[in-house]
Amino acid sequence: MGTAAEVRMVLYEDDSVQVNYADGSTLQLSPCGSEFLFEKAPPPSTHPLEQPERIRQRTHFVISNYREQLQRALDFRNSSATCPFLSESIIPSERKKRVFIDFSEVEWPSPDRDDCITYSESGIVKITSLDGHAYLCLPRSQHEFTVHFLCKVSQKPDSSVMPPETKNRVPKEELVGKTRNVCRSGRLSGQRLRNKENEPPRQLLTSKNASANIHCVSETEGREELPSPGTKRRYVHVWVKQSWSAASCPEEWKYPLSLGLRFYNKVPAASAADAEVPVSGIVTSDNPEERGTGVSVLPRALLLSCSAPHMHRWNFCDSLLQRQSDAEEYSYPELIKVVWYKGVTYRLTHKNVNSIEIFPGDGSVFKSEGTHFGNYFTYSSQDNSGKREEKTYSVNNLPPDRPGNLYSVRSLIKQATRILQHCAKIRLSLSHNYRVCCWRMAPGVNVSSILPVLLKESLIPGVGRFLAYSDDKVHAVFLDGVTLTLNWDLSSSAEKTQVDQGLRLRWCRLTFPDGQDQLIQTEHPGVYERYVTSVVTWCRRLTQTSSRHVSPRLSPVPEENWSVASELEKIQKFNWLLENSGVLNLTSGKKNEQCSSDHCKPGSSETLPEATNEESVSVALKRTSEVLQDIDYLLSLTRK
């Protein structure tokens, strides 16, 4: 069975994957990677209302018809995923490696070591870990880098009952004690020095408190003893390749990346081509944040089976007619992490604002810039001689395509703009469940603790209802049926609100009564200015009020308890207000006058307290019923 070529591959923030093929078929991977859904392309003679054929299987038990496509989809997922999924049954044997130890971290060389940093003729710096279990490659452009590391294959759930700390520990019978010098700090336990035989000590510092006082103590270190064949268990590991942007480097790769960047900063491009370049001249930075740590904790592979398969969400069209009418390219309700489209890679970050980087594949990069997302794109490239070229493109004034160019700048930027617009809609939607996925749900974790809570709710007469959530999302419902959603940093100080520092995303989402929505720039709202101004003013007032309190954040609004006790508490408050308002005194005076005129016997009311209470309750209920009927009548008139 021939396999069609991939046209678009999308990796979302929850590590789910969607692949579109040239023949119209699609493949979707669950966030954990343990399950996939393949939707075949319908033949041309298919009725428009006929549903396409779908195959849903476990990844570990994939049949041969979809093995090749699934392998490429998993490689794309693992290249930028937080935790890889490595099924031993579908991984080629040349990528597997059997070792006698189960390790979870690697140690990188100090900057004064020149035997672990190499420079190739193609202009790539390679930094190898001391144990050889990982290495990082940084090209001359320094825009992106690749890292290769050994990772243990995915295990069955029953073999992963032990905690990670216990599983990563080598058994005592496999260890032979030897003495080592450990460099410790009185303030920082992560600082240490490791010694191997006949090697000088290497100081490995974490990213914080690098100037802490250091003293060395003697300790027993485990040394791995080579087991005899057939007596010790061998662990299957797989070489995993990941690609990252240098501007948004994960924490575990910051230290080796800093070594590669210092190599280019200290060694000129002309002398870097020389194979005899001394790397020992590279010194560490005085800034501990830039230095990072010398030990990287490797990503761990997910389990073969998912513990929450009910959370797998599949996106597909029910018919060919719906597929043709749906023009949305990215319809999955999740933020996008990486897009591969016709050989071009798009990488996104969602820290404070949505930003995107375009890697055409020739060593150059396009980066989104500007106050609003994607208003401008900066182009940067570097040739073999080290000469850099930079340009700036405006989204509203893109250059025409030129014959002979490797790619169309107009097409690349337009595609990036569509991706950014999708991410803006997701960030401005009220579907808060996009933060929850199956592999993040550890046993015993409450989903409600992950979802945002309501912080503030206000009902403004004549305007509408305003709500603020803990994920910095503000939602407003106006009286005319229009709803507005924007992101506002509720922890921003009142002094900065005049420049709208609290406005995290310079866009807002308007939803009209007919269900249509539209993205509006908050600084240029046009005819929707009154909606945007009302919400921004309310957010400013909210941050000013919260800044006067001791707590930097607003406290969550407690949920109403619709129990009998709460209702009785409301009745008691109502009675207290009624007694202190003077209404009861007025009615009691009228009753006394009526009793005196009718020559009532004194003490008659006291002799029958139960009858009086029952009568007063019945009268109150009757009046309440009449008031409710009047309210219902008025509401029915307004509806007409």
UniProtKB/Swiss-Prot annotation:
Residue numbers spanned by region Disordered: 594-614
Signal peptide residues on this chain, from the entry's feature table: none
Domain of life: Eukaryota
Full protein name: Uncharacterized protein C5orf34 homolog
